[in-house]
Amino acid sequence: MMRTHYCGSLTEAQIDQTVTLCGWVHRRRDHGGVIFLDMRDRDGLVQVVIDPDTPEAFATADKARSEYVLKITGRVRRRYEGTENPNMVSGQIEVLGKEIEVLAASETPPFPLNDDTINVSEEHRLKYRFLDIRRPEMLDRLRFRSKVTNLIRNYLDDHGFLDVETPILTRATPEGARDYLVPSRVQNGSFYALPQSPQLFKQLLMVGGIDRYYQIAKCFRDEDLRADRQPEFTQIDIETSFLNDDDIMDLMEGMTVKLFNDLLGVKFEKFRRMPYSEAMRDYASDKPDLRIPLKLVDVADLMQEVEFKVFAGPAKDPKGRIAALRVPGAGSLTRSQIDEYTKFVGIYGAKGLAYIKVNEIEKGIEGLQSPIVKFIEPIVMQLLERVGAENGDIVFFGADKAKIVNDAMGALRVKIGHDLNLATCEWAPLWVVDFPMFEEADDGKWTSVHHPFTLPKSSVEDVKSNPGEALSVAYDMVLNGTEVGGGSLRIYTLEMQKAIFEALGISDEEAEEKFSFLLNALRYGAPPHGGLAFGLDRLVMLMTGATSIRDVIAFPKTKTAECPLTQAPAPVEANQLRDLGIRLREQQKKEA
C-alpha cells in the first residue's frame, strides 16, 4: 500500500501514529524556516509541517509547488493551541513530515484550484475538467452523487427490484425529441438510435415476468440545451408489475424521503398530491414551486363586458385566460421595478403587464394607483374583492392566450417570490397527478402529454369518442418547482394501445412498422404495470445547491453540445464514412 490514510480522514484518533499520505499540494507556505504544506486528496485536507531537522525532506518540500503529487510519511501530532482550524475535519491535528517523495511534478495550473471562489469561464473549466474536478467543491458534489446512487441501489434492492441492463443501440421511436442516430456498417443505409429512455424495453421486461426492474441508465436526446438539460443524461429508471399508482408513488416517495433524511438530514412530511388542473389554475405550472405562497386567480368572467380590448379579447376567447396575481405588501414597488417585471414577462411572449397598486381601498377608485383603472372602473372593486386585495398590495394581470399567460405569470409568480423573499420553507415536494392524456397541437392533431404508452383513466370507447376529456394515470414528482421524476401506469392491453395510436393519428401500418415488438408482446398476457424515472442529474443538482447540472456531472457537454476537453464532436476520416456508406455534402458558398 502506498498510503495508510486519506488526508481528509485524519483526526485526533491518530495522534502519535506514523502515517503515510499521498496527494496534491493544495497550498504551500514558508514561515521562518518551517514549511507548511496543505495536502489534499479526495477526502479533504491536512496540514503537514516540515522543519529543518529533517534536511532531506525539507529540501524536497522547498522545491514542491502547488499541484505537485507527493508521498509523505510523518507523525500525527496535536496542533499548538490557537492554531487549530475548526473548518477542517483534521483541523485539530497536523502531520510532522519526516520523508517526502515527489511522485509527479506539475506545471502551473491554468486557474487556481485552492480558492474558495473561481473566477474563470465555464468553458475554460470544462477544457481542463481533469483539474476542475480536483477542486474540493467539485469533489464534494461527485462524492455526494455517488452516495445518492448507492442509497438508491440499496433501497431498490431491499424492495425486491432487479438491476437489468437494456440496449444502448436500438431503433428510433417517436418520443418527442430528436434521436441521436448511429449508422450501421453491416446493414448499410440503416441506423440505430441511442435511447431517449429505456421505456419500451422496461415494459417488455414486465411482460417477461421480471416484476420489479431498475437501472441507472444513460439516455440521449438531441435537443436544445438549458441549465437543466444535457444531450446525454442519467436516469434512475424503475418499473414494477401488479402495483397501482398509489403503491408506486408511496414506494418512490419513501425512497426520496430516505435520500433527504440520510444525506441532508431533511425530514419530509407526507407529499401533497395536486391535480394538474389545480396546479395550472393556481400556479400556472405543472411543476409548481410551493415554497412561494402566491397564487393566481382567474378573472376573465369579470372582464367580458369591459371596453378595454386588452382584457375583453382574451375574456371572450375560449383559448384565452386572464389571471390576476396579488402580491401582499408589494405596493411600494417602484415604476422601474415594475418595468423590469414587464420586460421579464415579455420573454415568455406577454405583450405587457397591467397592474393596480392598492393604496387606500376604503376610498374606492380614488385609493388606487394604476394606468388601467379607468378602463375597468365598473368592475374594479369586484375584481379586488375576488383576489383578496388589501392596502399596500399590488395586483398584476396577464391577459392573452392561455399558454402565454401561464408561461409568463407562472414565471413571474416565482421570480417575485424570490425577489421579495416570500419563500415559506426550504423544500416543497409534491406529486402532480391527473394529467390530461392528450393536448392539441398547432395543427389541430392530438399529441401525448407524456408518451403514447401511458394508461388513460377512460375506457377504450371514451378515448375514441372524446380524447380531449381523457385523463391519464400519470404522476410527476416535483421539488421546488423542478420535475425530478415522472411516471405512469402503462397500457397493457392490445385494444387500448391501438385506441391510443388511433387517437394520435398513428395508422395501423405505422404502428406495426415502429412498434410491432410491443404490440406483439401485448398479445401474450402483459401484466398491469407502471413505473417512474428520476432525473439523477437534476436531483443531485437540487440536493447540492448547484446552479447547473453541468456542475454535478464529471464530464458534461456545453450548451452547444460540445466537449471542450476532447473536442467532441469532431470530423472523422473519409474511409470511416465510406465504410458506413455516408457521403458529406459540401455546403454551398454564400453568394457575395
Curated annotation (Swiss-Prot):
L-aspartate binds at residues 175, 221, 450, 490. Its main location: cytoplasm. One of its GO terms (molecular function) is ATP binding. InterPro entries: Aa-tRNA-synt_II, aa-tRNA-synth_II, aa-tRNA-synth_II/BPL/LPL, Asp-tRNA-ligase_1, Asp-tRNA-ligase_1_N, Asp/Asn-tRNA-synth_IIb, AspRS_core, GAD-like_sf. It holds the Pfam family tRNA_anti-codon. It is an enzyme of class 6 (ligase). Residues 199-202 are annotated as: Aspartate. GO terms for biological process: aspartyl-tRNA aminoacylation. Keywords: Aminoacyl-tRNA synthetase, ATP-binding, Cytoplasm, Ligase, Nucleotide-binding, Protein biosynthesis. It is found in: Cytoplasm. Gene3D superfamilies: Bira Bifunctional Protein, Domain 2, GAD-like domain, Nucleic acid-binding proteins. The keyword Cytoplasm applies. Aspartyl-tRNA synthetase with relaxed tRNA specificity since it is able to aspartylate not only its cognate tRNA(Asp) but also tRNA(Asn). Reaction proceeds in two steps: L-aspartate is first activated by ATP to form Asp-AMP and then transferred to the acceptor end of tRNA(Asp/Asn). Belongs to the class-II aminoacyl-tRNA synthetase family. Type 1 subfamily. PANTHER family: ASPARTATE--TRNA LIGASE, MITOCHONDRIAL, ASPARTYL/LYSYL-TRNA SYNTHETASE. HAMAP family: Asp_tRNA_synth_type1. This is Aspartate--tRNA(Asp/Asn) ligase.
